[in-house]
Amino acid sequence: MIMRRIQVTETTENKDLVQGDVQAETATEEVERSEVQEEIELSVEEQYEANVAELQAKLDDDEENRHLRLRADFDNMRRRQQLDGEAAEKYRAQSLLSDLLPVLDNFERALQVETTSEETASIIKGIEMVYRSLLEATVFEGLQVIKAEGEQFDPNIHQAVMQEQDSEKETGVVLRELQKGYILKDRVLRPTMVSVNE
C-alpha cells in the first residue's frame, strides 16, 4: 500500500508538472500573441503614419506648385499689361495721324498751285505755314515719310500701282512716287503708291 501512495503522489506531482507546463506554454503563447498583436498594431500605425506623411508631402508639393504657377501667371499678366501700356503710349496718335494723312495730301496739292497775283501768293504762304506747323507736329509724334524714288521696291512699304520701263535703271526700282506713304515709329500707316521699273 505504501507503494501505491507513492505512485499516486508521483502521478499527482506529474499531473501538476504537466499542468504547470501547459499553463506555462499557454502563458508563453499568450505573451507571444500579444507581442505579435502589438507588432501588427504598431506596423499598421506606422503604415498609417507613413501614408499620412506621404500625403501631407504631396499636398505641400501641390500647394507649392500651385503657388508658383499663380506667381508665374501674375508676373506674365503684369508683363503683358506693361507691354500693352507701352504699345498704347507708343502708338497713341496712330488713329489721329491716319485721319490727318488726307489733310496733308490736300495741303501738298494746294501748295503745288502756281499763282500770279500777290493776294493769292500770300494765301499760299499762309497755307504753307499751316502745313509746316502741322507737319512738325506729326513728326514730333513719330510720323515719317517713306522714301520711294530710286529705292528698291519693298512690298512692305510700297504699293505698286503701275509698271514702267527705263533701261537706265535696274529692274524693281521705284521710278515715281504717286502718293506719299507714311510710317509711325515702326508701323506702316499708309504704303507709298509707286510706279516700278520692269
From Swiss-Prot:
Its main location: cytoplasm. The keyword Chaperone applies. One of its GO terms (molecular function) is adenyl-nucleotide exchange factor activity. This is Protein GrpE. Homodimer. PROSITE patterns: GRPE (PS01071). InterPro entries: GrpE, GrpE_coiled_coil, GrpE_head. One of its GO terms (biological process) is protein folding. Keywords: Chaperone, Cytoplasm, Stress response. Participates actively in the response to hyperosmotic and heat shock by preventing the aggregation of stress-denatured proteins, in association with DnaK and GrpE. It is the nucleotide exchange factor for DnaK and may function as a thermosensor. Unfolded proteins bind initially to DnaJ; upon interaction with the DnaJ-bound protein, DnaK hydrolyzes its bound ATP, resulting in the formation of a stable complex. GrpE releases ADP from DnaK; ATP binding to DnaK triggers the release of the substrate protein, thus completing the reaction cycle. The keyword Chaperone applies. It holds the Pfam family GrpE. Belongs to the GrpE family. GO terms for cellular component: cytoplasm. It is found in: Cytoplasm.
